[in-house]
Amino acid sequence: MAYAADPRVDEYIDALPDWQQAICRQVREIAHEADPEVTETVKRRVQPYFVLDGNVAALLAAKDHVNVFLYDGAIVPDPEGIMTRGHDNTTARQISIRQGERINAPALKRMFQQIIANNRAGGWRKLKAAR
């Protein structure tokens, strides 16, 4: 899929071990497949973010895994149970992917699409207030 890659995101990914590069590149592709209008940026000096009408997700490589932070993940259904952390956080959730683990791309794409839809509807604060 063709998209405008932020060279700072490329630099971040290129500096990682091969197995983390592969994970980050796959998550990046999934984010752009979720909606062609998703853009990339870097926040907090080095952390890659995917945004569309608000934050959608961010990447952070750790020693033995890659974290995918889902913004407003607290109101996104997770029927396949791919979220691994953040259940005590009011809004964000996290998926940790370790070397050799398969990414559930269809489930992650659906989550990205739901977060984007929520962003377009005004974000989690507006959606929670309406409940």
Indicate residue ranges for each PLM-predicted region.
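Charge-dense, helix-prone N-terminal extensions
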Residues: 1-131
